[in-house]
Amino acid sequence: MKIGVMEVPGIPLGRQNVKDSRLDQADKLVQAKKKTYPQVEVVGAEDALEADTIVVLKENRLDLVLKDLEFVETRLGRAPEEAEKNLLNKMKAVLEKEGFISGIEMTPGERELISGYGLFTIKPVVEVSSEEVENLTALFIRILQDSGFICFLTVGDKENRAWLIKKGSTAWEASGAIHSDIQKGFIRAEIISFNDFIQAGGETQAKQAGKMRLESKEYIMQDADLANFRFNK
């Protein structure tokens, strides 16, 4: 995941670990040689349009709106075709009310129409305060949540690890976060909910208590699920 920071002092650029306490809890219950937190890539304002999510100080949110409004008005001034013109006018109306384009319901065709536009507020925008920057761990977790990301855990043997996926991802999609070969050969997902894992006192104990479920590729992953994927090699 890539986070675009619009001049928010105190948020470091580059790759950053998101220290999810649930992985810490899992690491205490299941021995492994290594613990790996999920990572995000933080880029500055000059690369923000390439990011999945935009982060801005609350007092500067209007700057993003004005950037997009200027872009939309410029496009309208070039006499676009009717379909584009109607969509641009819809976006203009929202921006003039200081809203974000991400709040507009669009058809797949409309999204395709503007896929090449350089718009900021079509992405999830997370508004933060200066005080929040003092606790980067909590801030990164909120940014992920507000941007529609969750994680799942894999534990045991060589590594205990948390993997980032979009909320609503299927088990098949989640397996691809680990390796494309696992996704291609997907058979079933062994799933233990995080609460069941903690209450049982570990992965082995949860299995013995009958808390492990076999799920198909269509299963919707839940936040902090423990997963092991069976696949054809």
Model region roles, listed by residue range:
Residues M1-K58:
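Conserved G1/Walker A P-loop phosphate-binding module
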Residues L49-P80:
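Switch/coupling subdomain of P-loop NTPase systems
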Residues E41-V43, E73, A224:
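A general secondary-structure boundary signal
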Residues K19-L23, T36-Q39, A51, L66-L69, ...:
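Amphipathic alpha-helical transducer elements in NTP-driven molecular machines
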Residues M1-I11, R78-I220, D225-A227, N232-K233:
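C-terminal-of-GTPase-core extension/linker across diverse P-loop GTPases
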Residues R22-L23, D47-A48, E59-L66, E131-E134, ...:
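Conserved nucleotide-binding/hydrolysis micro-motifs of P-loop NTPases
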